């Protein structure tokens, strides 16, 4: 039962949800409904005013940061990194929960980095600076970093926003591959309802800071829902 607000204005109102292991779970809803705020609370970026987020029965707020990072990766919508950092260096950051900052990469770490770049199809970009990549290439590199982290759960905040349609589909196909090939649990925020319908096992539809409905896409993407939630 998570609640969150700013300056007395409620943003999330008594939110309760559960995520089944091995599923792709997508949060949808109109702008300002609290989707990204909810994802930030799940990932511990924001602290709820009441309620708690549990991972296998343990409150994530009390978890050791490195231990939590070994289990859960987050890809925010806005990312800051030195533009001259190479793709390979960025993906190597995903190993820091295992090695510690400044820790030397072992052969296993290097193999994980190579595997992640291969899965994302960016091996040929390994020596390119992040600042020289297209938006789609950059997003694939960031997702590869999350994969190198070897978590059980990946949280993605609007991973297809501002990308050309071809890269949107590549990103979502990669997300599906991570779910199926690595049994990773995916929780993501999406704006595009068609993409949510195609790539999700379970959808949480939000309206005005609350969960409006949840279920398989075919069960909740109904005309009356679109009218009530999206006013279309």
Feature annotation, model-predicted:
Residues 43:
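Helix-to-loop junction immediately C-terminal to a conserved catalytic motif
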Residues 28-30:
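The feature captures the beta-strand-to-loop junction immediately N-terminal to the Walker
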Residues 104, 129-133, 137:
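Conserved ABC ATPase signature
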Residues 51-59, 68:
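Conserved ABC transporter NBD signature motif
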Residues 154-158:
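Catalytic Walker B motif of ABC-type/P-loop ATPase nucleotide-binding domains
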Residues 92, 107-125:
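Conserved ABC ATPase "signature" region
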